[in-house]
From Swiss-Prot:
Classification lineage: Bacteria, Bacillati, Actinomycetota, Actinomycetes, Mycobacteriales
Induction description: By acetone. Transcriptionally activated by MimR.
Protein name per UniProt: Propane 2-monooxygenase, hydroxylase component small subunit
Region Disordered, residue ranges: 1-32
UniProt catalytic activity: propane + NADH + O2 + H(+) = propan-2-ol + NAD(+) + H2O; acetone + NADH + O2 + H(+) = hydroxyacetone + NAD(+) + H2O; butan-2-one + NADH + O2 + H(+) = 1-hydroxy-2-butanone + NAD(+) + H2O; phenol + NADH + O2 + H(+) = hydroquinone + NAD(+) + H2O
Uppermost EC category: oxidoreductase
Superkingdom of source: Bacteria
Known EC number: 1.14.13.227
Gene3D superfamilies from the UniProt entry: Ribonucleotide Reductase, subunit A
Assembly description: The propane 2-monooxygenase multicomponent enzyme system is composed of an electron transfer component and a monooxygenase component interacting with the effector protein MimD. The electron transfer component is composed of a reductase (MimB), and the monooxygenase component is formed by a large subunit (MimA) and a small subunit (MimC). Requires the presence of the chaperonin-like protein MimG to ensure a productive folding, resulting of a soluble MimC, which leads to the active form of MimABCD.
Organism encoding this protein: Mycolicibacterium smegmatis (strain ATCC 700084 / mc(2)155) (Mycobacterium smegmatis)
Listed Pfam families: Phenol_Hydrox
Signal peptide boundaries: none
């Protein structure tokens, strides 16, 4: 009888430490569970910074192996040459509103509830029955036409560039901007539908022909369409939030609608338009911070100022033409509480103050 075979011993590969594993390198705070790889803007990192900073990869920060994906015949990732503006550190930008995924839904949901409650109360109180035909015509033509401008900016300006920036902080702010515009355009559409159902004197389809054919709106329509053709994401953001919104958007919303609606017995339209104004005020906060960062950049600041001055030379004349073309609208309401000249002067004054805040010279075209 043969002796039983001894069971073979299983062999395991020898463990070798290559110093590439997590925890291999010790440095200050390396044992802390709250260690951060970025320098927060304040003493402690906020929730906004925790969920946005360095979420989008960058070969200049931590991505030492370069882009790990990309198009076959194109650049990988998020190229910085998608804009002619330069920055020594794009990652220094922080959104003062601290917007991220959660706040988009929370803030927009609050506005939606406000608008729904406003429209529901208006229908229950039969508010629209007291509006005169002149004011109803003004709303159906002009507020309805502005809805197209907001929708165009939402879908073809901000949505198209909300993944073009070199950092997640910039792209998140632009994405929130797109959500604001989209929701505001939908609010105006809902308002239009409610009015069409509430009174036969209101033509709910008139806005389409006004936007496409009315002489006073064609210059505005032209600027919006020209904006959608711009490929440089930074120029698009500058031309829209700095120039167009100041000289055309705020002129129409703030200096006309918000000033004259109550005098014409309308307290509903200012409530809805006011939500769009609040959105733009928040969007202007991040825009101001971004362009102030670029004009004060220690390495590229002067070149950026020269570039932004060129952009002002392109877009200020176009937006002024659009603003001047809207002048007949100021004469349409029965109660004319403000003049076009005073409204335009107020818009120009705010635009001038904004340019001073981002260290840019006032363009000559503004005073012609």
């Amino acid at each position: 009888m043969s002796a039983p075979e001894k069971p073979r011993e299983r062999s395991f590969p020898k463990i070798e430490f290559t110093d590439s594993e997590a925890g291999a390198k010790e440095f200050p705070s390396s044992k802390s569970r709250s260690y951060s790889y970025f320098t927060p803007a304040k003493l402690r990192a906020t929730m906004y910074e925790d969920v946005t900073v360095d979420v989008q990869p960058d070969p200049d920060r931590h991505l030492t192996q370069g882009w790990i994906y990309g198009f076959g015949n194109g650049p990988g990732g998020y190229p910085k040459d998608w804009t002619t503006a330069k920055s020594s550190d794009w990652h220094a930008f922080r959104d003062p509103n601290e917007e991220w995924n959660q706040t988009i839904y929370r803030n927009n949901a609050a506005v939606v509830r406000q608008v729904e409650l406003c429209l529901k109360n208006a229908k229950r109180a039969r508010v629209y029955d007291g509006w005169n035909s002149t004011w109803l015509t003004f709303i159906e033509r002009n507020v309805g036409a502005w809805m197209h401008a907001e929708n165009g900016l939402a879908l073809h300006v901000f949505t198209s560039i909300q993944r073009s920036g070199p950092t997640n902080m910039i792209n998140t702010a632009v994405a929130v901007n797109a959500a604001h515009k989209m929701r505001f355009a939908q609010d105006l559409a809902l308002f239009n539908l409610d009015l069409a159902e509430a009174t036969e004197a209101f033509d709910g389809s008139a806005h389409r022909a006004v936007w496409q054919e009315a002489r006073e709106w064609q210059a505005t329509r032209k600027v919006v369409e020209e904006l959608t053709a711009v490929g440089d994401w930074c120029q698009l953001l500058f031309a829209t939030n700095i120039v167009f919104e100041q000289l055309v958007g705020s002129l129409f919303r703030t200096e006309l609608i918000m000033q004259i609606a109550a005098r014409n017995g309308d307290y509903i339209t200012p409530t809805i338009v006011g939500t769009g104004e609040h959105d733009y005020d928040r969007d202007l906060n991040y825009t101001r911070n971004l362009f102030r960062l670029l004009t004060r950049d220690p390495e590229h600041g002067e070149a950026n100022k020269a570039l932004f001055t060129e952009w002002l030379g392109i877009w200020v004349p176009r937006c002024l033409d659009a603003a001047l073309a809207l002048q007949p609208i100021w004469s349409a309401p029965a109660d004319k509480a403000v003049t076009f000249a005073s409204s335009l002067d107020a818009a120009k004054a705010k635009f001038t103050a904004l340019l001073e805040e981002i260290d840019l010279d006032i363009p000559e075209e503004l005073n012609k």
